[in-house]
Swiss-Prot record:
The lineage of its organism: Eukaryota, Metazoa, Chordata, Craniata, Vertebrata. Keywords: Acetylation, ATP-binding, Cell membrane, Cytoplasm, Helicase, Host-virus interaction, Hydrolase, Initiation factor, Isopeptide bond, Membrane, Nucleotide-binding, Phosphoprotein, Protein biosynthesis, RNA-binding, Ubl conjugation. SMART domains: DEXDc, HELICc. This is Eukaryotic initiation factor 4A-I. A motif (Q motif) lies at residues 32-60.
Length: 406
């Protein structure tokens, strides 16, 4: 091996990696119509009733290998239709007559798990498939009863509660044939890696594994090596993904303490539709909410310290449009899927640039238009440039007529 080859293989990290944590596709088949995927009639009805007309880039590539039973690693960002990719694959594969759990989906947050459950139920509406969200913060006894009485076809959950139910044998792995890890980068970084591995040990060795992730840091790929067999790798490249359709601006606020006044000046603009404001810490979410209320601005807030009931009520009000401005943290960036949101404000720039797309990818899902406004202090300028470079995008200074763009 020559020296240049040697250094190249080192730079590339694990097999199937290109530099910069991007996987290399090894599957080129594209099916550009749902009708050509050999899906059941009742599932197709659900897909069209849900409002899908043509499969998105990830759906055109990943549904088929998933249905064929391959292990699949799919790299695609938020807003590309990846939830429906695995939901359709699961619904096509389950045996409706078998009253047993046959597919298990893990997600990093409760909100995301509930959202996935809603998508599965909607797509499977004409099939009579059952799907249950197995998440922390809910009544354990009621959950145990549901699992024992009904044995839902599909379980979507967070790692802690799912492991607990498997461990206590209320959830049986016997018929689980498909295991999906959604937002795998988020789950495998910190905390959940061990729990996922423990869950995996309880599943049958021939269980199909599907892993979806916006980013592919090397530790994610290392973990996939432990529990995936010759996976199909599918990359939906950044340019097919979606900062497209989202106008990105920054406001030069110079100093942190000037952000609040700037936000209040923007408030009238925010309430034209619905807006999400992202902040980096839970404490600061509470602080900003208090400050806004003290100035008689109506805002609602949500973060991980709140109990599940409270979070559900807040999300319900926001989804229905009765609350118009939601202040939240990155934890929930991946669980807010509200069609009407066309404005996202980064009160704080994300500490982790990968989260930028999760935050603003909300606004312009499937090519819907959206506006993102970043508040930038002197210290933030380098981070902003870094984000521009990372996503190969341009973020301009906010024009005075921003209200006309929303």
């Amino acid at each position: 091996m020559s020296a240049s080859q040697d250094s190249r293989s080192r730079d590339n990290g694990p097999d199937g990696m290109e530099p910069e944590g991007v996987i290399e596709s090894n599957w080129n088949e594209i099916v550009d119509s749902f009708d050509d995927m050999n899906l059941s009639e009742s599932l197709l009805r659900g897909i069209y009733a849900y409002g899908f007309e043509k499969p998105s880039a990830i759906q055109q590539r990943a549904i088929l290998p998933c249905i064929k039973g391959y292990d699949v690693i799919a790299q695609a960002q938020s807003g590309t239709g990846k939830t429906a990719t695995f939901a359709i694959s699961i619904l096509q594969q389950i045996e409706l007559d078998l009253k047993a759990t046959q597919a298990l989906v893990l997600a990093p947050t409760r909100e995301l798990a509930q959202q996935i459950q809603k998508v599965v139920m909607a797509l499977g509406d004409y099939m009579g498939a059952s799907c249950h969200a197995c998440i922390g913060g809910t009544n354990v006894r009621a959950e145990v009863q549901k699992l024992q009485m009904e044995a839902p076809h599909i379980i979507v959950g967070t790692p802690g509660r799912v492991f607990d139910m498997l461990n206590r044998r209320y959830l049986s792995p016997k018929y689980i044939k498909m295991f999906v890890l959604d937002e795998a980068d988020e789950m495998l970084s910190r905390g959940f890696k061990d729990q996922i591995y423990d869950i995996f040990q309880k599943l049958n060795s021939n269980t199909q594994v599907v892993l979806l992730s916006a980013t592919m840091p090397s530790d994610v790929l290392e973990v996939t090596k432990k529990f995936m067999r010759d996976p199909i790798r599918i990359l939906v490249k950044k340019e097919e993904l979606t900062l497209e359709g989202i106008r990105q601006f920054y406001i030069n606020v110079e100093r942190e303490e000037w952000k609040l006044d700037t936000l209040c000046d923007l408030y009238e603009t925010l309430t034209i539709t619905q807006a999400v404001i992202f902040i980096n810490t839970r404490r600061k979410v509470d602080w900003l909410t208090e400050k806004m209320h003290a100035r008689d601005f109506t805002v609602s807030a949500m973060h991980g310290d709140m109990d599940q009931k409270e979070r559900d009520v807040i999300m319900r009000e926001f989804r229905s449009g009765s609350s118009r401005v939601l202040i939240t943290t990155d934890l929930l960036a991946r669980g807010i899927d509200v069609q009407q949101v066309s404005l996202v404000i980064n009160y704080d720039l994300p500490t982790n640039r990968e989260n930028y797309i999760h935050r603003i990818g909300r606004g312009g899902r499937f090519g819907r238009k959206g506006v993102a406004i970043n508040m930038v202090t002197e210290e933030d300028k380098r981070t902003l440039r870094d984000i521009e470079t990372f996503y190969n995008t341009s973020i301009e200074e906010m024009p005075l007529n921003v209200a006309d763009l929303i």
